[in-house]
């Protein structure tokens, strides 16, 4: 029997198990509303695994998953690996052991991979399609070198919503349902009135959420008034700041990203991004997770917006890490220093008489939205002039972590790698679409 036949049989068997479990849950709800609620919270209905694939010998199961992982390396055939992880707990545990995260294997397989750091030794190439009529943005994983004809693998979507004092981008794993109440929403991006300061919110708890630092504060409200449901939270994981474009319309914008959820030590030898989810499948989110978050006018002035008063030069690493002009202590520097990203300084092109960045063929249309982000390891220097070229930075400082640029009308490429995740890179890229009233 071929591996594709095995996967097909497993998928059919898994579908019958899901239907059987659904029927059992329906019967449980018929017993009564109050009894059904207690039953749902404290006594989950077990699904009887009657499929013959659930009792395969471990050696045979390992061989099947390893062969499948090696042969189905790209999408859309990689969906068979996802199907195997959904058969039963035994298959899921085997997939967790064999299928590595994007940081190690350079592949996006499960939904949780969107929150995990990209590859260390490579680049995750993606592209974004913009639908101006609906103000919707779609992130795809590139499956080929020709971006304009590449259908890609859908990863995330974002819906732009205007408010009186700000703009919001709701980020979802669903390409069609972008309502605020869906359980596929995983975060959002919120701007100030001028479009110069942004905050990235995530529904996943960051590693420092329980600390007293600024990045650990959360927004909590109950999903429905008068109910005893568990509150849902969104966590501020990053701040983005844009400043006056000293290069005019011919150069990239000046931006800085303060990544609360990524420590600066993650770029050092042996460094890691903490608090990575153990589950390979996405945890089910509360259906009112975004409806429960308060974003009133007063909430705009929370800890996240304190970043708006800090100058670009204040958020640097010179005499010591500083945030908003305050130099961190030794203990804070050791425990809480976040990763700081800033845009790479362009070089002056004598023939074109303009500022240029080397996107290595991934960006083909000049746009003020184009940018490259690198780790900030020294104070931001003043604007270079044609007579005073910028001295080349050290190789480790010059490594591009995220680049974004235009290739056609409503088509943009987005390439990222460790320590950013697809969700974080997408949110940062979305900030470039917003109008910057005070930057140009």
UniProtKB/Swiss-Prot annotation:
Pfam families linked to this entry: F-box-like (PF12937), Tub (PF01167)
Domain F-box: 51-106
Tissue: Ubiquitous.
Similarity remark: Belongs to the TUB family.
Protein's name according to its UniProt entry: Tubby-like F-box protein 13
Encoding gene, per UniProt annotation: TULP13
């Amino acid at each position: 029997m071929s591996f594709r036949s095995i996967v097909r049989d497993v998928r059919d068997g898994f579908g019958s198990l899901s239907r059987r479990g659904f029927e059992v849950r329906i019967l449980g709800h018929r017993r009564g509303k109050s009894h059904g609620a207690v039953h749902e919270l404290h006594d989950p209905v077990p699904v009887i695994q009657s499929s013959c694939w659930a009792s395969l010998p471990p050696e045979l199961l390992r061989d099947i998953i390893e062969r499948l992982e090696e042969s189905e390396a790209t999408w859309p055939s990689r969906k068979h690996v996802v199907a195997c992880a959904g058969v039963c707990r035994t298959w899921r545990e085997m997939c967790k052991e064999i299928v590595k995260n994007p940081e190690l294997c350079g592949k996006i397989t499960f939904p949780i991979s969107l929150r995990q750091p990209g590859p260390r030794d490579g680049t995750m190439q993606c592209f974004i399609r913009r639908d101006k009529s609906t103000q919707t943005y779609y992130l795809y994983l590139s499956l080929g070198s020709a971006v304009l004809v590449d259908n890609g693998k859908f990863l995330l979507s974002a819906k732009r919503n205007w408010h009186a004092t700000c703009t919001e981008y709701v980020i979802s794993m669903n390409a069609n349902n972008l309502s605020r109440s869906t359980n596929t929403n995983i975060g959002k991006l919120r701007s100030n009135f001028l479009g110069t300061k942004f905050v990235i919110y995530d529904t996943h708890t960051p590693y420092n959420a329980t600390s007293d630092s600024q990045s650990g504060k959360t927004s909590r409200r109950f999903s429905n008034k008068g109910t005893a449901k568990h509150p849902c939270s969104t966590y501020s994981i990053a701040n983005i700041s844009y400043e006056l474009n000293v290069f005019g319309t011919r150069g990239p914008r000046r931006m800085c990203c303060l990544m609360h959820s990524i420590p600066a030590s993650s770029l050092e030898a042996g460094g890691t991004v903490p608090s990575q989810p153990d589950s390979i499948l996405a945890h089910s989110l509360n259906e009112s997770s975004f409806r429960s978050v308060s974003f009133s006018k007063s909430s705009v002035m929370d800890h996240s917006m304190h970043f708006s008063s800090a100058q670009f030069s204040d958020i640097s690493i010179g005499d010591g890490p500083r945030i908003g002009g305050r130099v961190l202590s030794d203990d804070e520097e050791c425990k809480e220093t976040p990763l700081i990203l800033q845009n790479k300084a362009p070089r002056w092109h004598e023939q074109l008489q303009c500022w240029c960045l080397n996107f290595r063929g991934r960006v083909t249309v000049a746009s003020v939205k184009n940018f490259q982000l690198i780790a900030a390891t020294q104070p931001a220097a003043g604007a270079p002039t044609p007579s005073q070229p910028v001295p080349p930075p050290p190789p480790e400082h010059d490594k591009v972590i995220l680049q974004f640029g235009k290739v056609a009308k409503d088509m943009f490429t987005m390439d990222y790698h460790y320590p950013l995740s697809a969700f974080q890179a997408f949110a940062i890229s979305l900030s470039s679409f917003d109008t910057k009233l005070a930057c140009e």
